[in-house]
C-alpha cells in the first residue's frame, strides 16, 4: 500500500485516490524564458518517477504539467532580445522538450500553456470578486484579499501574522494588506494584454495554475506537486484562490521535492555555480544525471558536484556491467523476493534510494551468474526509467579520459591481440596499461576481448 508524505499535513499518509484506480496529478512546470537548469531537471525526473510508479501500481494516471508562457521575466527577456514573447517561449519550449527526452522523461498527458486559458482565469477572478475575496485596486490591478480566507498559511504551517513578520513585503498603497497578491495586472505599454471587466491586462502567476488545474482535472483532485521553493507563496496562494472560489477542498496530497545545491551552496547565478541541463549533459551521459537524481530521496536536498556525478557514473556502470547479455525488459514478477522489496521501498513515499539498493543486490547475484537476477534487474530498472540500453552501448559510450573514441579503442585492442599472437607480451601489456590509464577496462574471455569505460 502506497504511503506519501503530504506537505499539507506534514505526515506520511496512506494514499487513497478520490476515484478508485484513477489518479489526477498536477505539477507546476517551467516559466519558459531560458534554458532549463538542474532544479528543473529534478522536477522533471522526480514527477516522471512518481507517474511511472503510480502506473506500475495499476493506477490510470492523468498527469498535467503546465507551461507559464506569459510572465514579467518572459516580457523582459523578449524585449532584450528584440523578439515577441510568443517567439521566445516557443523556442524555449522546444529546448525544454529536448532536455526532457534526453533525461528519459515521459511527456505529461496535458501540457497547458497559460495564454490558452485566460478566459478560465478571468472567470475564476470574477468568482473571487463576487465572493468578496478579491478587489479591484485604484491602479486597475485586481488583488486577492488574504484576510478573507482564514485558512491562509495552512500549507506553510504559519499564521498570517507570522507570514507578514517573516516576509519582506514592499508597502503598496494599492493593497489593503501587504500580503495580498495580484490576480490581474493592468496593462502596460508594449506588453501583451487581454480584455477584462477591469480593463486591459494580463493574469498574475498564481491564478494561472488554479484555472488550468480546475479546467483539466476538476475543482478537487488527488496530487499537486512541484519544487519546495513553490510551497510559499505560490502553492499557498493556489489553495486560497481555488478553495475560496469553489468552496471545496482543492488537493488531497501535496508533494514537494527538495532543493538542488551545488557543492553544498545554494545554486544561483550570482555565485557563479548555476548550471543548465545542457551544460551538465556536455560532461555526463543523460542516464547518469537521471540516476544521480533518483539516488537521492525526492524530499532531501540534492547536492550537485562533479565528484557526486562521477560516483553516480561508477555506480551505474556497475549495474550495466551486470546486464551484459541480458534481454530486453519484460513484465515484473512482483511475487519474487527482490521485486517485493523494491515495491516496499517505492510504496514508502517513493523511496528510490532503497529501491536502487535492491538493484545493486540483484547486480551482485547477476555477476555470480544468476541470469534470472539480471532479468529482474532489467525489469525493475524499467519501472523507474533506468537500465534499458544495451549494456555494451552504455559501457562504451562517450570518450575516454584521453579522448579515445570507440573506433580508436577497438584499433588498440586489435593491436594488442596481434602482439599476443606474436607472443610479444611486453607490447600487449603496454597497450593494456595505456588503455587502463585512459580509463578503459579490458576483459579477456573465451569469446575474445571486451571493453568498458571505468
UniProtKB/Swiss-Prot annotation:
Record EC number: 6.1.1.16
Pfam family, one: tRNA-synt_1e
Motif range ('KMSKS' region): 266-270
Major subcellular location class: cytoplasm
Placement of sequence motif 'HIGH' region: 30-40
Cofactor note: Binds 1 zinc ion per subunit.
GO process terms (BP): cysteinyl-tRNA aminoacylation
Keyword Zinc attached: yes
GO cellular component term, pick one: cytosol
Binding site for ATP: 269
Reaction(s) this enzyme catalyzes, per UniProt: tRNA(Cys) + L-cysteine + ATP = L-cysteinyl-tRNA(Cys) + AMP + diphosphate
UniProt GO MF annotations: ATP binding; cysteine-tRNA ligase activity; zinc ion binding
Keywords tagged on the record: Aminoacyl-tRNA synthetase, ATP-binding, Cytoplasm, Ligase, Metal-binding, Nucleotide-binding, Protein biosynthesis, Zinc
Cofactor field: Zn(2+)
Subunit comment: Monomer.
Entry similarity comment: Belongs to the class-I aminoacyl-tRNA synthetase family.
Official protein name in the record: Cysteine--tRNA ligase
Gene behind this protein: cysS
Amino acid at each position: 500500500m502506497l504511503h506519501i508524505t503530504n506537505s499539507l499535513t506534514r505526515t506520511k499518509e496512506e494514499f487513497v485516490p478520490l476515484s478508485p484506480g484513477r489518479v489526477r496529478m498536477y505539477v507546476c512546470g517551467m516559466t519558459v524564458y531560458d534554458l532549463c537548469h538542474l532544479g528543473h531537471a529534478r522536477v522533471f525526473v522526480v514527477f516522471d518517477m512518481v507517474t511511472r510508479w503510480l502506473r506500475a501500481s495499476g493506477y490510470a494516471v492523468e498527469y498535467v504539467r503546465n507551461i507559464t508562457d506569459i510572465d514579467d521575466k518572459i516580457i523582459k527577456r523578449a524585449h532584450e532580445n528584440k523578439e515577441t514573447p510568443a517567439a521566445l517561449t516557443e523556442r524555449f519550449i522546444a529546448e525544454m522538450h529536448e532536455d526532457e527526452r534526453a533525461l528519459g522523461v515521459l511527456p505529461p498527458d496535458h501540457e497547458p500553456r497559460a495564454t490558452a486559458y485566460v478566459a478560465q482565469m478571468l472567470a475564476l477572478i470574477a468568482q473571487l470578486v463576487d465572493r468578496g475575496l478579491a478587489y479591484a485596486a485604484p491602479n486597475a490591478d485586481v488583488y486577492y484579499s488574504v484576510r478573507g480566507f482564514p485558512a491562509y498559511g495552512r500549507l506553510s504551517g504559519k499564521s498570517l501574522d507570522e507570514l507578514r513578520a517573516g516576509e519582506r513585503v514592499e508597502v503598496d498603497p494599492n493593497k489593503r494588506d501587504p500580503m495580498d497578491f495580484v490576480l490581474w495586472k493592468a496593462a502596460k505599454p508594449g506588453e501583451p494584454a487581454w480584455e477584462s471587466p477591469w480593463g486591459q491586462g494580463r493574469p498574475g502567476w498564481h491564478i494561472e495554475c488554479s484555472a488550468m488545474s480546475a479546467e483539466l482535472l476538476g475543482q478537487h483532485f488527488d496530487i499537486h506537486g512541484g519544487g519546495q521553493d513553490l510551497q510559499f507563496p505560490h502553492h499557498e496562494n493556489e489553495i486560497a484562490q481555488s478553495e475560496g472560489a469553489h468552496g471545496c477542498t482543492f488537493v488531497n496530497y501535496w508533494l514537494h521535492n527538495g532543493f538542488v545545491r551545488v557543492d553544498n551552496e545554494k545554486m544561483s547565478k550570482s555565485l557563479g555555480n548555476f548550471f543548465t541541463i545542457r551544460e551538465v549533459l556536455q560532461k555526463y551521459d543523460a542516464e547518469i544525471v537521471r540516476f544521480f537524481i533518483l539516488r537521492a530521496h525526492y524530499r532531501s536536498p540534492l547536492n550537485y558536484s562533479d565528484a557526486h556525478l562521477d560516483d553516480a557514473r561508477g555506480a551505474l556502470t556497475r549495474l550495466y556491467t551486470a546486464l551484459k547479455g541480458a534481454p530486453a525488459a519484460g513484465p515484473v514478477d512482483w511475487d519474487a523476493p527482490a521485486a517485493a522489496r523494491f515495491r516496499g521501498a517505492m510504496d514508502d513515499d517513493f523511496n528510490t534510494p532503497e529501491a536502487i539498493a535492491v538493484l545493486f543486490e540483484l547486480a551482485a547475484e547477476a555477476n555470480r551468474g544468476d541470469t534470472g537476477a539480471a532479468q529482474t534487474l532489467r525489469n525493475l530498472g524499467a519501472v523507474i526509467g533506468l537500465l534499458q540500453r544495451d549494456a555494451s552501448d552504455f559501457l562504451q559510450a562517450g570518450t575516454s579520459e584521453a579522448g579515445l573514441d570507440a573506433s580508436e579503442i577497438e584499433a588498440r585492442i586489435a593491436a594488442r591481440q596481434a602482439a599476443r599472437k606474436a607472443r610479444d607480451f611486453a607490447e600487449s601489456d603496454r597497450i593494456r596499461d595505456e588503455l587502463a590509464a585512459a580509463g578503459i577496462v579490458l576483459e579477456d574471455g573465451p569469446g575474445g576481448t571486451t571493453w568498458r569505460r571505468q
